[in-house]
Amino acid sequence: MVYRNNNTIYQILFVMGKIISNILSSKNKYGNFLLACLYSLVYDYMYKNFVYGLFYYIGRIDYEPMSIERTIIWLLLSSIPFAEYKGINKISSFFSLFLYLFVYIPFIHSMMVLYSDDNLQIYSYCLVMFIFAILYFKVGNDWTPIKNIMVKPQIPFKAIEYITILLTIVFVAIAHNHMHFVNIFTDMSRLYDLRSENSESESLAGIGYLQGWLFGAFYPFVLVLYLEKKKWVKVLLTLAGYILLFMVDMQKMTFLMPFVLIILYQIVRLNEQKVSYYIHSYIMLTIICFSCIVYVKQDNELIFTIAAILLLRTVCVAGWLTQLYVHFFTENPYTYYSHINIINYVTQNYPYSVPLGKAVAYGSQNANANFFLTDGVAAGGLVGICFIGIFFFTLLIFINSISARYKKTDLFVLFMPTISFFLNTSIFTTMLSNGLLPLALIVACTNINNCTSSK
């Protein structure tokens, strides 16, 4: 009798596990919709009680409570696009997932709780973003207008290695007098001082391109093959390269990125299919669970510090920055892309005396933001969002095409650094200064023996 009862319990647990697994799978569009609704509701609660409740003083952060009708519209706008997500089938799906979680949901929410009587502006912005969100997920599925772009003759991998070494030597030769190693966990004040000092140094002018190309293109590319071939000495040398970059820019992301890439590679390699179908659930449920912990343990100093980094500066940052940009450019002139140096060099039409991020924050901070804000709202309002949305859509199609012969495991690592830039900088800065354009050229022009068809 006891054995039969235990067997029944195991069967019930097995069935429940199957049901939960099915709901959390990206193949279930209804599960995606429900998870997006839950995530959006938790996001709203944390934005109201943590971001707005505790940090409203950092800028023009609004929270106008939504009516029932507006809440329903907000939930539909937030959740319907995610029903089109079907897992990481192409690299554009990887871009679109992070863009959805850390740009789209905060953007829609921030517009819905904005202190504004201009409903036409609010709903037109939201509708355009809604259409683009659906298109971005669509292009990551089966729809492929351009297939397999490959430049011939192909450049051998050895040539990329030599170029990487040469660029590293040039970087060290230029920046060696400004290199310092600082513990990112215990010596934060010195880290910020050195970061500011190096950023203002005239002798380091122009080195940003070199650093961005190494960080976002060359180092990830060689790291993938070294991990694939288990060339551990060369893996360590690549880590050393990242540390050299960190010793100049003093950015925590630069120091942590190689470790993130290696861990990500190993996780995806263990079960590529499961990661492809469930990575969205892992990320969203982790944020939901952490938000619950913050709610219960918000008086704990350690929890509060982590929450400030994870929620204020990562999950919700696009939300309050959206409100900063919308408020600012409702009252001030658009840049018409003159915030991009090369365009301003030709037009000499940039309307502000300080960089865009500082202008928007009225000099109180450097409010760098995602490309929908910098290259959209700041550049031309609704028209700017339409232009940059179409540009990004075209870019996703191109990236899908050049990466079609690569394994997903490799693509996760290759494009992770540039995805991290997409979330807080101009799309043109990401392409030119942070390595996306060189990476795209390398992927299209190089034939490495771990290239294979995507599954």
Please place each PLM-identified region on the residue numbering.
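Small-residue-enriched transmembrane helix-hairpin modules in multi-pass membrane proteins
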Residues: 17-30, 34, 38, 42-65, ...
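Intrinsic-disorder-associated, low-complexity terminal segments enriched in Asp/Asn/His/Tyr and depleted
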Residues: 3-10
